[in-house]
Amino acid sequence: MNEQPNEELQSEDEQFDPQETVSFEGETAANDEAFAEAGEETRDEEMTRLRGEVEEASKRVLQAQAEAENFRKRLRRDTEAQLKFAGMPLVTDILQVRDNLLRAIEAATTAGDGESAAGLVEGVSMVRKQLDDVLAKHAIKEIPAEGELFDPNFHEAISQMPHPEIASGMVAHVATPGFQMHDRVVRPAQVVVSTGDGSA
């Protein structure tokens, strides 16, 4: 009866195979290696995807820059065109005044000698009034000068003269009228400035 346990142990030892353990460990190592390779492929795919996203973002940035540059060029062209032709309304109105001036001259040349001078004066006076109205329409007005205190911001002194009735520093005579548009001087009035009566 004592021999049976030994036989059972021997039988169990015979059933244990170390090669099977080695084979199992080999399969585990192979699985780990395969998993690592799969992980490397996943990282490569991720890098490829990220590179694609970066390239796409770069394309969008370049496209946005190109659109912005085109907008700036178009805006610059439009601004230049507006500045270039900003005076068109004024020119149109002045051309109408020129037409009326030519009509006044033609009427004076076809009239008799006596009527010619009077008609010319009247016609030119009317044209001048029309021209002043056109200038006023475009916010262009004559700078007050004669009898005013000399102001270098609006007046240009071309000479001085004594005057018994006009105080020193006052404008005694206007040689060429000055004009301003809104609050900006287009050209200063050229004036003669009084030095007073000279008694001092």
Swiss-Prot record:
The record's section on InterPro entries has: GrpE, GrpE_coiled_coil, GrpE_head
What is the superkingdom listed in this entry's lineage?
Bacteria
Record GO cellular component, one term: cytoplasm
The reply on keyword Cytoplasm is yes
Cellular localisation? Cytoplasm
Record's compositionally biased regions (Acidic residues): 1-17, 34-44
Q: List, alphabetically, the Pfam families matched.
A: GrpE
Q: Where is this region: Disordered?
A: 1-49
- GO terms classed as biological process: protein folding
Q: What keywords appear on the UniProt entry?
A: Chaperone, Cytoplasm, Stress response
Q: Name one GO molecular function term.
A: adenyl-nucleotide exchange factor activity
Q: What is its main location?
A: cytoplasm
Question: Whom does it interact with, and what assembly results?
Answer: Homodimer.
Task: Please explain the role this protein plays, according to its UniProt record.
Answer: Participates actively in the response to hyperosmotic and heat shock by preventing the aggregation of stress-denatured proteins, in association with DnaK and GrpE. It is the nucleotide exchange factor for DnaK and may function as a thermosensor. Unfolded proteins bind initially to DnaJ; upon interaction with the DnaJ-bound protein, DnaK hydrolyzes its bound ATP, resulting in the formation of a stable complex. GrpE releases ADP from DnaK; ATP binding to DnaK triggers the release of the substrate protein, thus completing the reaction cycle.
Which family does the similarity line name?
Answer: Belongs to the GrpE family.
Protein name per UniProt = Protein GrpE
- Write down the species: Rhodopirellula baltica (strain DSM 10527 / NCIMB 13988 / SH1)
Gene symbol here is grpE
